[in-house]
Structures are given as structure tokens and as C-alpha cells.
């Protein structure tokens, strides 16, 4: 269930986040996420699902013995979250001026994103979900040649560390993390370190070389 892929079409009741000692109010976060969604694609009168909407979707799925695997893609495909992070913190959180990818070497960008993800991880874990897909594909490929640029700029290790940190958040909540394959040991490159063995790799492409 791709609730966060470029846009973020599901808002929790409490969207407040604390980053670097500063708390951003729930309504302010919702407003900035909504603005980011509209900038990506204006869906009209209903741009986001509410928490009660999602509660109902999950309850119906469970009644039919259907398992929900939520997806919030990170650190790429994050147009709405990136827009909100930059607007709220006043820090440019973008990688390579991408409109969709946070800079994994920027501590504010990482802290904001992980704080927001934690709320969704907690929500879906509380609903009994066994897996959480963090995406982790197509890094800033709207502005660069993606993971090749990270390796060239010696930031691939930052990506590995970021993915492992998010995976650890998911595992700590009792779920299994999923990531798409193209950024995992990109082009057989191991210079960034070792990815967590807790991650289930989902193959959607033969990879970009």
C-alpha cells in the first residue's frame, strides 16, 4: 500500500515532530505536507486519507484475511516530505537540488525524515503489519545519474548508513524492513559498507549500470 511515494497521501491525527530540539506542531506539518502533495499532483477536494480512513481500510483488509504492507519511500521519491522538511526547518534538505530526494549527508534532513517515519512505523506496527517497505530506490535521479553520483561523490556510505538506520527503526517496532534492489550494493559496489541483513530485498529492476 504505497501511502508515500513522491506524495504522502495519508496523514496521521498527530503529525507533530521534534527535530534538533525543536517541535513542529501537527497542523503545521500537515499544512506543509498538503502543500507538497498539491505541488506534486493536486487530487482535488481529497488529497490525503485521514487516520480514520486508514483504520477502516486496514480493518476491512483484515476481515478478508488480506495483509497490508505499507510503503513510504525514502530517501528518494519524497517530494511532499522533502518540501515540508525544507519549509519547516529552513534548511535546504535536498540532494543535488532534487525535488524528490533528501540529502542523506544532511543531518537535519535525516533527523526530520526519521522522526516522521517513526510515527508511521509505530502506527502500522500497532495495526499488526508484519512488513514495512522503505523503498530506497532511484536516488535523486531527477537531477543526477542516481547512485552512481553518490559513489562518485563518496556519499554512498551515507546512503548505506541511512538505510540501515531506517531498517533498525522498523525492526525495533517488530516489523521486517523491505527495500527495492537498485540501491543495494549498486553495480556490485561495496565501498559504502554492509547493508543490514534484516532487510528483505524486493527486485523490481535488473539494476542501473
Predicted feature locations:
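Catalytic-core regions of glycoside hydrolase
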Residues: 126-127, 139-142, 148-209
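Feature activates predominantly on carbohydrate-active enzymes
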Residues: 1-147
Amino acid at each position: 500500500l504505497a501511502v508515500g511515494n513522491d506524495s504522502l497521501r495519508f496523514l496521521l491525527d498527530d503529525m507533530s515532530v521534534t527535530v534538533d530540539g525543536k517541535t513542529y506542531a501537527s497542523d503545521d506539518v500537515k499544512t506543509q505536507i498538503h502543500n507538497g502533495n498539491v505541488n506534486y499532483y493536486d487530487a482535488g477536494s481529497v488529497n490525503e486519507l485521514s487516520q480514520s480512513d486508514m483504520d477502516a481500510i486496514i480493518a476491512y483488509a483484515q476481515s478478508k484475511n488480506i495483509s497490508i504492507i505499507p510503503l513510504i519511500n525514502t530517501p528518494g521519491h519524497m517530494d511532499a516530505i522533502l518540501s515540508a522538511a525544507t519549509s519547516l526547518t529552513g534548511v535546504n534538505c535536498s540532494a543535488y537540488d532534487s525535488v524528490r530526494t533528501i540529502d542523506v549527508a544532511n543531518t537535519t534532513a535525516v533527523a526530520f525524515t526519521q522522526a516522521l517515519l517513526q510515527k508511521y512505523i509505530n502506527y502500522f506496527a500497532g495495526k499488526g503489519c508484519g512488513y514495512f517497505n522503505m523503498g530506497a530506490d532511484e536516488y535523486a535521479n531527477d537531477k543526477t545519474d542516481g547512485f552512481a553520483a553518490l559513489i562518485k561523490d563518496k556519499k554512498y556510505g551515507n546512503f548505506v548508513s541511512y538505510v540501515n538506520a531506517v531498517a533498525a527503526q522498523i525492526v525495533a517496532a517488530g516489523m521486517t524492513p523491505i527495500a527495492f534492489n537498485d540501491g543495494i550494493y549498486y553495480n556490485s559496489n561495496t565501498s559504502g559498507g554492509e547493508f543490514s541483513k534484516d532487510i528483505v530485498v524486493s527486485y523490481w529492476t535488473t539494476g542501473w549500470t
